Amino acid sequence: CEEKALEGVAVYREYFDRQGIFENRVYPGIEGMLDGLKRQGCRLLVATSKPETAAVRVLEHFGLSGYFAYIGGATLDDSRVRKGDVIRYVLESCGIREKAQAVMVGDREQDVKGAKENGLEVVGVLYGYGSREELVGAGADYLVESPQGLVHLLMK
């Protein structure tokens, strides 16, 4: 059974690497939001549960990688897969020790929990995959409904 599972994972990873990686889209307003935040002097970082190599490829494919000072993600050898571990890795890699200097923006429960585990405030975005109930239940500090709402909140 374990051998079949490993075969399945290998088939999925091969498909994902070949074409599945790009089977998504950028939400409307995201590029304008990133541009606006960067112009306002925000240092933008990525902490994703996707494999780091895949995250870089996706952001480059959609022309968004230039907005980010650092792109961090999970490892392919499973040594860093938990969201809290990825966030910690990004914070350490970027020399962020003062947690008040950073805020996590996410759309799922694991984003909120991983950020809280690292002492960060969290903005839950309602234009992603998670629901209001999921984000509130996980303990998000703020909720926004649009990329423009995120800019407004962060620039206060």
Q: Whereabouts are the PLM-identified features?
A:
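Short beta->alpha linker loops
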Residues: R25-G29, K50, D107, Y127-G130, ...
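Substrate-recognition element of Asp-dependent hydrolases with the DxDx(T/V) motif
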Residues: M33-L59
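Metal-dependent phosphoesterase signature
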Residues: C1-G32, Q40-C42, A100
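Acidic, Mg2+-coordinating phosphoryl-transfer loop and its flanking beta/alpha structural elements
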Residues: V103-E145
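Surface-exposed amphipathic alpha-helices with a cationic face
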Residues: E31-R39, L91, V112-E117
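Conserved H-loop
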Residues: F22, S65-A69, R97
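Conserved Lys-Pro-Asp/Glu-containing loop-to-beta segment of HAD-superfamily phosphomonoesterases
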Residues: K83-K113
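A short, structured active-site edge motif that brings together acidic residues
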Residues: S65-R80
